[in-house]
Amino acid sequence: MALTAALKAQIGAWYKALQQQIPDFIPRAPQRQMIADVAKTLAGDDGRHLAIEAPTGVGKTLSYLIPGIAIAREEDKTLVVSTANVALQDQIYSKDLPLLRKIIPDLRFTAAFGRGRYVCPRNLAALASTEPNQQDLLAFLDDDLTPNNQEEQKRCARLKGDLDSYKWDGLRDHTDIAIDDGLWQRLSTDKASCLNRNCHYYRECPFFVARREIQEAEVVVANHALVMAAMESEAVLPEPKNLLLVLDEGHHLPDVARDALEMSAEISAPWYRLQLDLFCKLVATCLEQFRPKTTPPLANAERLNGHCEELYELISSLNNILNLYMPATQEAEHRFAMGELPAEVMEICQRLAKLTEMLRGLAELFLNDLSEKTGTHDIVRLHRVILQMNRALGMFEAQSKLWRLASLAQSSGAPVSKWATREVRDGQIHIWFHCVGIRVSDQLERLLWRSVPHIIVTSATLRSLNSFSRLQEMSGLKEKAGDRFVALDSPFNHVEQGKIVIPQMRYEPLIDNEEQHIAEMAAYFREQLESKKHQGMLVLFASGRAMQRFLEHVTDLRLLLLVQGDQPRYRLVELHRKRVTNGERSVLVGLQSFAEGLDLKGDLLTQVHIHKIAFPPIDSPVVITEGEWLKSLNRYPFEVQSLPAASFNLIQQVGRLIRSHGCWGEVVIYDKRLLTKNYGKRLLNALPIFPIEQPAVPDVIVKPKEKAKPTRRRRR
């Protein structure tokens, strides 16, 4: 469809009307350029897909919503906006779209949050109830759904009252009633514990109400994981050809796609034996109490026992082989170089993939049959078996996926990283097997780039080292396929609004010097805090270990510090805002992930402290396998893998400071390698243009280094 004059006029009229709705609206050339580029791509006038980097301040959300809605209406398609985190998803759903509804008549929109963000009305009813009969019923259903105390029961009763009276939509983030993580875990549910259409609360369930609204909506706000799953299953969202898709925070997309090529599962022989025995008993119960019209051949007791026995023998053999590869210590790990399994192990994995897939199919068949029997059997007994079969299905789905991945030699032309771990919990030894694909371009091509006619990939940061090369390699987007790559200018004057400070550190932030380097960092930080020049500060670390060492040096300042992990992130940010607004000093402290999406303007944040250049962890099995593969292709892992990742992280961290025309301040980076190493200049050149200062560091009294207890990473 061409971008007609009428469509251009409609987009222009909405943009003009928007300016009347926003106080102190500042027209920006980059925003107008983005609206035009998005419109041309979605209308099919310019290329296949568009990757557009829109720095903070451009107003990217409204820049894709306005043309997206106009073209969706013209073509009778659904605009799907996908984000990577709940905060941005909720901002678009609760703030941006309601604003646009004021200027766009009858705009229909909804949000598709993950199941875990919604309350389960069945669980809420149980936790809000004071009736012993209700608790007895749930105990029979194997659910741990009793309030811990009377206060918790009253809180749940208030939540239930709000839900029943439509004051609350069931989303965790949309209630003012405090819900701690432990309580929410019992209030929400997952796929394995959901009764779906068999549930008494199905019609009013917030999760399923939201899913039904998708069919009527013009705009659906989703997340990347849901979009990928929907494209795979062809469910939830409209057909790909009837979509206009915007992937906001698009730099996360390769990592989300990688989740489809990532699996870790326990494979300990005793644990496996228990799961198989429980499943055999469950099948026997189904045949005895809820016999299907046609009994699946594999459900025959003798055949099923033989099938499970073969499965157990293979798992037992694999346990023995993996234990030989792993060191003799109780806790151990073995990674297979280049993801290449020995022939014997590969044969076992291929057979396990087939056997577990057959059990997955059997569990699914029984589950479908059980779901049709709700009108003819004791509902409580039936629901108990449905829940148990649901959990068995989830377990076999995970195992089937694990062994399918293990059986792959390559994915998207690159190895699949594979490793085994042994760990001790409660005195018991557990064996785990892990698989992660290191490239996902083929999956993205199949599910997205080839399926949806036109897609917008956007973020404040898409490039690293001033190049789209890393994004192209990881995502599979390419110019020769008709994809366009655009980097918009920032609307801010960074030279006037801020500066970069690189203190004159004696030590580089290497592991051997970590204690001395952090002591220097703490001394400079203390000096800055005591100067009282900055009310709102943020300190970011590359590792939890370094953060804890830093905190040991500033124990006397602990009341000023709001540290990641002390409380949920949103509560820390709320408290920080409150402190600074009241004229107090406040310091947020966390890992680099803590800062993503953090939007603190003006005096709320005027000084950002960055511990060091955040290179990828060198001990990650995935990073090591990728490095081996790159070397086998005569490519330099540091240039292809480590440096672009470090550049991206640094751009994200520095980007926390200047969020509006009224922002000011400085970014302190405690890493002299930016000035002494050849790559340092390249990292600095990829940042906004700030003046650079190099102040002296106060004298430090170094504490004696305590031997850290060895820690072992379970996952990448």
Mark where each language-model region is:
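A substrate-engagement module of RecA-like helicase motors
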Residues: 2-20, 26, 75-78, 83-218, ...
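Walker A/P-loop
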Residues: 44-66
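Signature of the SF2 helicase/ATPase Hel1-core->accessory helical subdomain module
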Residues: 64, 70, 90, 94-98, ...
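Conserved RecA-like ASCE P-loop NTPase motor core of nucleic-acid helicases/translocases
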Residues: 78-87, 456-460, 535-542, 669-670
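A contiguous, basic/glycine-rich beta-loop/short-helix subdomain that forms a polymer-engagement track
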Residues: 185-218, 228-237, 365-506, 517, ...
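Conserved interdomain hinge at the start of the Helicase C-terminal
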Residues: 446, 503-542
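Conserved RecA-like P-loop NTPase helicase motor core
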Residues: 503-515, 566-675
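Conserved helicase motor "Helicase C" RecA-like lobe of SF1/SF2 P-loop NTPases
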Residues: 542-566
